[in-house]
Regions:
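Auxiliary Fe-S-binding modules of radical SAM enzymes
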Residues: 32, 37-120
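Core AdoMet radical
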Residues: 1-34, 43-59
Length: 120
């Protein structure tokens, strides 16, 4: 997998796509900017989460929804990890209190993993 938290590192997706791997995934965490359009061809799984730190930057709900919609349209599984230290309402609180619901639902899709996937 590769981390893609800002648009300037989207080139990492192409690098990942060209590597031999059983499961290819993006970790969009901490998501600190709108990533815009994503080419998720041959990407199996997309994980999204907010930043958790004292000086955390907020993550906007529309950024998360855009990634979710693109993943669904392109056949990648979507996993929303958590809002981070700043909730969707802009309030700073613990990661646990901000939770992991997106539009009142949880998204915890994961690819199937078996011994063959892990060890070939």
């Amino acid at each position: 997998g590769v981390t893609v938290e800002v648009p300037s590192v989207k080139y990492r997706i192409d690098c990942l796509r060209n590597l031999p791997a059983s499961i290819r995934f993006l970790s969009c965490e901490p998501l600190v900017e709108d990533l815009g359009e994503l080419d998720l061809t041959n990407i199996d799984w997309v994980i999204v989460g907010g930043e958790h730190a004292i000086n955390a930057r907020p993550m906007k709900e529309e950024w998360v929804l855009s990634i979710k919609e693109q993943a669904e349209k392109q056949g990648a599984l979507f996993f929303f990890k958590q809002w981070g230290s700043i909730g969707r309402d802009g309030v700073y609180r613990s990661v646990e209190r901000n939770g992991s619901e997106l539009q009142r639902k949880t998204y915890k899709a994961m690819p199937a993993v078996n011994r063959h996937t892990l060890f070939g």
